[in-house]
A protein has these predicted regions:
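Acyl-CoA/ACP chain-elongation machinery
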Residues: 23-83, 116-130, 159-168, 185-238
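Internal helix-turn-beta structural module
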Residues: 214-263, 267-268, 277, 282, ...
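Short glycine-aspartate micro-motif
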Residues: 25-29, 92, 110, 156, ...
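Conserved small-residue
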Residues: 8, 15, 44, 95, ...
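Stable alpha-helical structural segments in soluble proteins, enriched in small hydrophobic residues
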Residues: 11, 137-149, 174, 178, ...
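Active-site-proximal alpha-helical scaffold in enzymes
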Residues: 1-33, 86-105, 198-223, 234-244, ...
Length: 350
């Protein structure tokens, strides 16, 4: 599914919708894009939204920095006095399951994805101009968070943060207006494109991977390439993480991952702390089921550790299954008025 910079979240939403409707137990979702080539780069230059050597040097000069060489490590400066986006490349994939299926197979729960909100703009003044839809998705995410948590602690937005003039003013206004309207105080804000560039379709996957890493390690990566916020950045009720911040993981309730895509493809995804899910388990499952899950989880973590150790030593034993257990339509398939029967699979209702 293609939705410009919101593509990953569109795919995540498709999986979430199917899981919540009990049509599937799990899905592998993601996006991959490699846009750094002459044709794509020339196209972005035509939009005037991309940083080039001349713009970067001028930006460095405005900041009183050396202009003898380009500092590519700070070419993209989200929410700062910047000069345009920098193209990046990425491939991000995730396994999404229902809670019941995760417990059944002994999966390690890394987070909860309760909501993905999408609102595409129909009427726009230009193809790349932000519209009203992102206010809607962000307000929906904030509102549902308020309903879901009784004792609220900290929250953090991993912003779209492209490093363009338009983004810094419009996205900060979205965040501030929604936070202020819904009485969310001291909302932390960071972004990743100062590290990775703008990876286009997989950008939401970068944000998801980052949020999982923060829940695991307790460090929020700051806007380290941005020395100071631009004058037109809206700051009310927002706490921009200008440097890396170490946090207590238990004090962080949720992340809000935001995408403001070309063509008005807006999406905001709520990511809840895995501890939030673990506290709910006794309300949903029996003690016997939880004990069984915890034993299976130990085995999962051991396999994960062993696999990681092999990878670190250069052993990559990839799984590639070809011509294994293929179903024969003459022998393994039966179709009737009510269902489709497949050998060794549950019936499919029709």
């Amino acid at each position: 599914m293609a939705g410009a910079c919101a593509t990953f979240f569109y795919n995540l939403n498709a999986a979430s919708t199917l899981i919540k409707s009990d049509e599937i137990d799990y899905a592998v979702i993601g996006s991959a894009e490699a846009p750094i080539n002459p044709e794509v780069t020339d196209g972005f230059f035509a939009t005037t939204g991309i940083a080039d050597d001349k713009k970067i040097i001028a930006m460095q000069e405005r900041h009183g920095e050396s202009i003898e060489d380009i500092d590519f490590s700070k070419a993209c400066r989200p929410f700062g006095d910047n000069c345009g986006l920098v193209l990046g490349e990425s491939s991000q994939f995730a396994v999404v399951t229902s809670l019941e299926f995760a417990i059944k197979i002994g999966a390690e729960i890394l987070c909860a994805v309760p909501h993905v909100f999408i609102n595409s703009d129909g009427i726009k003044k230009s193809i790349s101009s932000p519209g009203i839809g992102n206010y809607i998705t962000m307000a929906q995410a904030f509102s549902n968070y308020i309903k879901d948590f009784d004792n609220k602690k900290q929250t953090c937005v991993i912003a779209h943060g492209t490093g363009t003039f338009q983004n810094r003013s419009t996205e900060s206004d979205v965040l501030s207006k929604c936070a202020t309207s819904l009485d969310i105080k001291n909302l932390k804000v960071t972004g990743l494109k100062g590290y990775l560039g703008h990876t286009m379709g997989p950008a939401g996957g970068d944000q998801l991977a980052c949020s999982l890493g923060i829940f695991n390690q307790g460090i929020i990566p700051g806007l380290n390439s941005t020395p100071i916020l631009a004058d037109d950045v809206v700051k009310e009720n927002l706490n921009f993480c200008m440097t890396n911040e170490e946090i207590n993981i238990d004090d962080l309730d949720a992340f809000f991952l935001n995408a403001k895509g070309f063509g008005g493809n807006n999406a905001t995804t709520s990511i809840y702390n895995p501890n939030f899910v673990k506290k709910l388990l006794p309300e949903i499952f029996t003690k016997k089921e939880i004990n069984s899950y915890e034993k299976s989880l130990e085995n999962t973590k051991k396999k994960k550790f062993d696999y990681n150790e092999k990878c670190l030593s250069g052993e990559f034993n990839l799984l590639y299954r070809a011509n294994e257990e293929l179903l024969n339509p003459d022998e393994d398939l039966e179709i009737n008025q009510d269902s489709i029967k497949l050998k060794d699979y549950p019936d499919i209702e029709i």
